[in-house]
Amino acid sequence: MATYSSNDFRPGLKIMFEGEPYAIESSEFVKPGKGQAFARVKMRRLLTGSRVEKTFKSTDSAEGADVVDTNLNYLYNDGDFYHFMHPETFEQHPVEAKTVGDAAKWLLDNAECIVTLWNGKPIQVLPPNFVELEITDTDPGLKGDTAGTGGKPATLSTGAVVKVPLFVQIGEVIKVDTRSAEYVSRVK
């Protein structure tokens, strides 16, 4: 695998650190007036999802992580595992519920997700960036109730809760950004 200097660290790069794969979320190169330059790096441990902040000297380097991002279709959940299938080879990958984590609330049947594999084992699941879900529960918007931000919580068909505008009603289908869990628009 390729070796990356700390100067080459960019968001999205996956590296091996302390024997495990990490994804770099942000990297700030600092060149003090006195002393050696360094990179202040925020990264996420792919096996557990925990975030770590680390300082690397400008002479430090890290090996690229041998991870593969593959597009897999979500099939079903049997309680302990979420099952995904490769669309071309039809190979199935069971993924533990703790690995799926918060992504579970955005999973729809046959949704194409990005699953990160390390040594053939799924370690991360990213749902599609946008999903269309039906609202199953929300308060009715009262006429003239527009003071403040004008939002109300709504429960979606998968159990996720997002803040929506007052005019959105139960039974409507909305588009949601899964990265920020925010309402985008109504679907006609």
Swiss-Prot record:
One of its GO terms (cellular component) is cytoplasm. Signal peptide: none annotated. Gene3D superfamilies: 2.30.30.30, Nucleic acid-binding proteins. GO terms for biological process: peptide biosynthetic process. Pfam families: EFP, EFP_N, Elong-fact-P_C. GO terms for molecular function: translation elongation factor activity. InterPro entries: Elong-fact-P_C, NA-bd_OB-fold, Rib_uL2_dom2, Transl_elong_fac_P/YeiP, Transl_elong_KOW-like, Transl_elong_P/YeiP_cen, Transl_elong_P/YeiP_CS, Transl_elongation_fac_P. CDD domains: S1_EF-P_repeat_1, S1_EF-P_repeat_2. It is found in: Cytoplasm. Keywords: Cytoplasm, Elongation factor, Hydroxylation, Protein biosynthesis. May be beta-lysylated on the epsilon-amino group of Lys-34 by the combined action of EpmA and EpmB, and then hydroxylated on the C5 position of the same residue by EpmC (if this protein is present). Lysylation is critical for the stimulatory effect of EF-P on peptide-bond formation. The lysylation moiety may extend toward the peptidyltransferase center and stabilize the terminal 3-CCA end of the tRNA. Hydroxylation of the C5 position on Lys-34 may allow additional potential stabilizing hydrogen-bond interactions with the P-tRNA. Its main location: cytoplasm. Involved in peptide bond synthesis. Alleviates ribosome stalling that occurs when 3 or more consecutive Pro residues or the sequence PPG is present in a protein, possibly by augmenting the peptidyl transferase activity of the ribosome. Modification of Lys-34 is required for alleviation. Belongs to the elongation factor P family. This is Elongation factor P. It comes from Erwinia tasmaniensis (strain DSM 17950 / CFBP 7177 / CIP 109463 / NCPPB 4357 / Et1/99). The gene is efp.
